């Protein structure tokens, strides 16, 4: 039995503000058996009782008592105490309210107050003191803090070492997804959250049960349908890489110019880095195509092969137009610079005391260079949109390995040019096509195995640039920013095969080896089938998935009812609403100013450098005229959208970076208020439309069942509406920072305290690693 009041610590940790030792500390819980909820294949590796989870740093009256558990999937804090101050919780079905996936852990710090010792724990390290405090720094900017004042000293030490060991695996097959899938194959009847845990039928799951299937581009037919959808008549699906016989970092099927024979491709492949020969991404209706390729490493054959490839791409164009090559390695920042900018952004968002540097906040943000890089990728992609759309030239994105920057630029161009990729299903298919199947190295770039030298947040940068477009053109996107934030979080859950591997070949190879070691019979399957992140029902209820829908969205056609019959109302091609896209007071606010088109001093944003040389001056003036004309017209929400790049238009994605900071919350404020009101309005329109449609088909009560199938999270008052809306709305909605970040207990502080709080994210050099 432990006392009601823990001993007063004699050491004040500089990691966070000192723990409060007031007399109002929460009383001890009743001793009862607390058991975790485990997924198939998940096992508890260590646990400790009588742990106190700190909710705030300036008081301990809200702290929770419970059991801290480390499994092979997550750390979990189990308590019977209700979460204080929290009126809403957006729950992930795979994770409890106090759970953190092991692959989301950034840094582990143990502290002993009495001996004045602290240590950053790495894998296979020893801990020579008994910790009184454990601080978990997460990749999503959360901080979770536990106290062991009443726990057994040895038990506390063991659980800390277990967390450090299992959160930093050295082998891919040690990630939880393998145990999960292995368990599924041994017991095919297993289901998770009422949903089959198989990796077969994958659906977008963003709302209704009739959601369109997300193509995974693992088969010939998926690629064939995409070429037909885009009208790529001069291109064909190639199958020479079946079994990954040519390249281990390309998909088994991809699209190439029809004039290139398989035998030629096999010969050319040896000259490219990673054997990543040119492959098709997308085609414009005017015939221009977007192509990706790695560098040609054979200097002697470079000119010959390059000319042959360009000729083949030219022949695939209906007008036999020339090819424009963009060297991304020269035009954009590299992955190391992007990682350095993200580290600085992380430090700024959750580390710097705002009261001391309030007047320097914007300059500090600028010095991180994160927004500069966001602008650089948007700008470069917009310039290539001009080449594809106005110049009618095919564009080749060239990069050394062709699997980092080209993933981002190719995806961003397609989001700007093709409204299909601004729908939920289309966006998911884009990620499958340009990231997962094209060999983006999720394992290394997300640092699942703690190889920090290869880490770089390129996928997050893509989501950020997409959010910038969503913010500027809200009616052009079917999905919401909540969807983008949840998608970012899913990259840090070691369950989904979507974000777990460096290439499709690695998935097949590693999962086959694992299956053999576990005596799993694969049959005709190519490796184990891992759950797909697009099966959203595994993570969220149907009600919560409605938050993925954007109430601003204007679809291609909208159903309407006239005299009880349903008709289709076609919007004019140039639909426009001043509330959705304000016109600039002058053209200087758009993309066509000198500041936006030309690189400023000390900027990494360079002008396009085509190879071979082309008429750069005439193209520059043509691009300027193109952008002027485009911004002078109302936006076509069902066509091309271009970003505004001035300082006022490129913003920090607050929901992603500030959601766990209580001081950054605006109670009953932020974009959620407009989202809430528009959701109610959209739901009311949908409800009235459904009622009118069924007016002649049956009694009024017959339509009420359909009314429950609302696509909106916030619903207008209806006959069967009992859910209501959350009592607490803030700029962090639907995420609640309470209990996930040890900060001040007062929620909704003034904006002058926007980033105030504790010093965190200490480097190993900063800490005194005393043993």
From Swiss-Prot:
TM region(s), chain numbering: none
GO terms for cellular component: cytoplasm
Keywords: Phosphoprotein
Top-level division of the source organism's lineage: Eukaryota
Annotated InterPro entries: MTMR10_PH-GRAM, MTMR10_PTP, MTMR12-like_C, Myotubularin, Myotubularin-like_Pase_dom, PH-like_dom_sf, Prot-tyrosine_phosphatase-like
Phosphoserine: residues carrying this PTM: 603, 745
Domain Myotubularin phosphatase positions: 217-657
Family per record: Belongs to the protein-tyrosine phosphatase family. Non-receptor class myotubularin subfamily.
Protein name: Myotubularin-related protein 10
Native source organism of the sequence: Mus musculus (Mouse)
Record gene name: Mtmr10
């Amino acid at each position: 039995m432990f006392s009601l009041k823990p001993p007063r610590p004699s050491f004040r940790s500089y990691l966070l503000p000192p723990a409060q030792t007031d007399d109002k500390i929460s009383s001890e819980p009743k001793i009862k058996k607390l058991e975790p909820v485990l997924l198939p294949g998940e096992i508890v590796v260590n646990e400790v009782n009588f742990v106190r989870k700190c909710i705030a740093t300036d008081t301990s009256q809200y702290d929770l008592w419970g059991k801290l558990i480390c499994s092979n999937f997550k750390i979990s804090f189990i308590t019977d105490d209700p979460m204080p101050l929290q009126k809403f919780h957006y729950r992930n079905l795979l994770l409890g309210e106090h759970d953190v996936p092991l692959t989301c852990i950034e840094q582990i710090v143990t502290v002993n107050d009495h001996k004045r010792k602290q240590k950053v724990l790495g894998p296979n390290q020893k801990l020579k003191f008994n910790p009184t405090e454990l601080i978990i720094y997460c990749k999503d900017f959360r901080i979770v803090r536990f106290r062991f004042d009443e726990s057994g000293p040895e038990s506390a030490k063991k659980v800390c070492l277990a967390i450090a060991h299992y959160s930093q695996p050295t082998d891919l097959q040690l990630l939880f997804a393998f145990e999960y899938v292995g368990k599924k194959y041994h017991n095919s009847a297993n289901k998770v959250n009422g949903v089959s845990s198989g990796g077969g039928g994958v659906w977008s799951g963003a709302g209704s049960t009739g959601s369109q299937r997300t193509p995974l581009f693992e088969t010939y037919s998926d690629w064939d349908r995409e070429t037909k959808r885009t009208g790529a008549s001069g291109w064909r699906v190639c199958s020479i890489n079946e079994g990954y016989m040519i390249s281990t970092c390309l998909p088994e099927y991809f699209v190439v110019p029809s004039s290139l024979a398989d035998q030629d491709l096999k010969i050319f492949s040896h000259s490219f880095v990673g054997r990543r020969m040119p492959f098709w991404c997308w085609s414009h209706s005017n015939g221009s195509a977007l192509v990706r390729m790695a560098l040609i490493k054979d200097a002697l054959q470079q000119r010959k092969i390059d000319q042959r490839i360009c000729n083949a791409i030219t022949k695939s164009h209906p007008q036999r137009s020339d090819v424009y090559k963009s060297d991304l390695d020269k035009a954009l920042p590299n992955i190391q610079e992007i990682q350095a900018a993200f580290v600085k952004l992380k430090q700024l968002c959750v580390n710097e005391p705002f009261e001391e540097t309030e007047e320097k906040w914007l300059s500090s943000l600028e010095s991180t260079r994160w927004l500069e890089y966001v602008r650089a990728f948007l700008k470069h992609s917009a310039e290539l949109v001009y080449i594809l759309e106005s110049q009618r030239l095919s564009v080749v994105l060239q990069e050394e390995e062709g699997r980092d920057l080209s993933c981002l630029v190719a995806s961003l161009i397609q989001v700007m040019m093709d409204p299909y990729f601004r729908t939920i299903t289309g966006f998911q298919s884009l990620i499958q096509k340009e990231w997962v199947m094209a060999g983006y190295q999720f394992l290394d770039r997300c640092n699942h195995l703690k190889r920090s030298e290869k880490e770089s947040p390129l996928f997050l940068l893509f989501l950020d640039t997409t959010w910038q477009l969503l913010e500027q053109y809200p009616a052009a996107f079917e999905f919401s920013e909540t969807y983008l934030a949840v998608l970012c979080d899913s990259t840090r859950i070691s369950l989904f095969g979507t974000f777990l591997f460096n290439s499709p070949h690695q998935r097949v190879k590693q999962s086959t080896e694992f299956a053999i070691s576990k005596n799993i019979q694969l049959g005709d399957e190519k490796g184990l089938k891992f759950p797909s992140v697009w099966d959203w029902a595994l993570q969220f209820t149907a009600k919560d998935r409605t938050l993925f829908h954007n109430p601003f969205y204007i679809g291609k056609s909208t159903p309407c009812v006239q005299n009880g019959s349903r008709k289709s109302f076609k919007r004019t091609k140039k639909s426009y609403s001043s509330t959705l896209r304000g016109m600039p007071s002058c053209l200087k606010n758009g993309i066509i100013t000198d500041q936006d088109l030309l690189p400023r001093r000390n900027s990494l944003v360079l002008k396009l450098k085509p190879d071979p040389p082309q008429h750069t001056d005439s193209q520059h003036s043509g691009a300027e005229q193109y952008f002027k004309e485009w911004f002078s017209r109302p936006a076509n929400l069902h066509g091309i959208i271009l970003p505004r790049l001035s300082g006022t238009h490129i913003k920090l994605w607050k929901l992603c970076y500030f959601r766990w900071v209580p001081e950054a919350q605006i109670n009953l404020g932020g974009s959620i208020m407009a989202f809430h009101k528009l959701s109610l309005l959209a739901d009311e329109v949908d409800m009235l439309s459904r009622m009118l449609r069924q007016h002649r088909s049956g009694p009024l009560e017959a339509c009420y069942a359909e009314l429950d199938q609302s696509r909106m999270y916030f619903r207008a008052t209806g006959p069967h509406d009992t859910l209501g809306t959350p009592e607490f709305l803030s700029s962090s909605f639907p995420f609640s920072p309470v209990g996930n970040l040890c900060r001040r207990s007062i929620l909704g502080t003034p904006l002058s305290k926007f980033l105030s709080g504790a010093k965190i994210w200490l480097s190993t050099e900063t800490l005194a690693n005393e043993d």
